[in-house]
Amino acid sequence: MSKRCASDRDDKDSEPVKKPRFSIANILDEVEDEEDVEVDVEDVDDVDLSSIPSKSPERSRGRPKIGLKMKEGNLPIECKLEGSELWAKFFDLGTEMIITKSGRRMFPTVKVSFTNVILDALYYIFLDVVPVDSKRYRYIYNKSAWLTAGKAEPVPKNRYYLHPDSPFTGDQLLKHVISFEKTKLTNNEVDKTGHLILNSMHKYQPRIHIVQRQKANPLDPNKVVMSEEKHCTYTFPETQFMAVTAYQNQLITKLKIEKNPFAKGFRDPTGRSPDEMERSPGDMMLSNFYHSSALQQAMFQQCLSKTLQLNPSIMMLYQNVFPTGNSLPAAPTVPGNPAEISIKSE
């Protein structure tokens, strides 16, 4: 009998404890599965960038070797990704690119250079973006990670974006870096402006294509078939990105604001760059004094001086402020500043 009781007790201890439907544990589990609130760069005024950690808490992404590339084709031409260090920084966090109906430019920008070309040949440089896999993703904010969320949506027809300065001679390619800064990404399936059409929450890989032709036989860019051309295709794994309609990872938002020269208006309410923000407190106080109180006082005195010139009788009202007579005191200046202001009445 005692053995049976002991056995029954063990069975009860081994049974999983059922949590009430509305328990705190259940509520916390549901919160864990919620999707992140989208944050676009236009809304960063509500984001405290100083509170965002500089490193992502998620697991390592297996950073690719800088300069590593995959090459396909029948030409001996070599291609190098310029700015690969910046791309690697974004890759470590999980690069995101905004797509809109009207089209949005990429940052970082795809920039490449070429070697082993024929100097007098013609070269056409293309960029396209292809899906990495057949999955759709979602971003889990409290885990700082992208997770699969089902099968991919139908893939839009692939487009090649021809660099607007094509064709290049081999000599020109050796002397210049080819930048696709004007390339735009869109989610408009009926786009007719030549933008690259992508699906949001899908992962993509940019590719560079170079097609060689002789000057006597130029290429029609609207009828190009890569497999029928003398060409090479280059893929740099660190340029992979997630297409989004609003930035999901706040670390990506922070890095884009820091590195994108067109986002300087979002960096600091005072307009200071990161280098200026690292200056000593004394320098910052001096700079703030010059740009605020000194400048405002000088402007006020200039307006007052002009008013007194037009109506000298008003001076009677300011005897307590200016006891020296008709002369206004000079505005304070900052020694050594090339833009010193010192305004006196004439």
Curated annotation (Swiss-Prot):
InterPro entries: p53-like_TF_DNA-bd_sf, T-box_DNA-bd, T-box_sf, TF_T-box, TF_T-box_CS. This is T-box protein 12. It comes from Caenorhabditis elegans. One of its GO terms (molecular function) is RNA polymerase II cis-regulatory region sequence-specific DNA binding. PROSITE patterns: TBOX_1, TBOX_2, TBOX_3. Its main location: nucleus. Pfam families: T-box. One of its GO terms (biological process) is positive regulation of DNA-templated transcription. Keywords: Developmental protein, DNA-binding, Nucleus, Transcription, Transcription regulation. Transcription factor. Involved in cell fate determination; required to pattern the posterior hindgut. Involved in motor neuron fate determination and maintenance, acting as a transcriptional repressor to counteract gene activation by transcription factor unc-3 in a subset of motor neurons. Required throughout development to repress transcription by unc-3, probably acting by binding to specific promoter elements. Represses expression of VA and VB motor neuron-specific effector genes, such as DEG/ENaC channel del-1 and the innexin inx-12, in DA and DB motor neurons. Residues 33-48 have a biased composition (Acidic residues). It comes from the Eukaryota. Residues 33-66 are annotated as: Disordered. Disruption phenotype: RNAi-mediated knockdown by injection into the gonad results in male progeny with grossly abnormal tails with no spicules. Hermaphrodite progeny are constipated and show backward uncoordination. PANTHER family: T-BOX PROTEIN-RELATED, T-BOX TRANSCRIPTION FACTOR TBX20. SMART domains: TBOX. The gene is mab-9. GO terms for cellular component: chromatin; nucleus. Residues 86-268 bind DNA. SUPFAM superfamilies: p53-like transcription factors. It is found in: Nucleus.
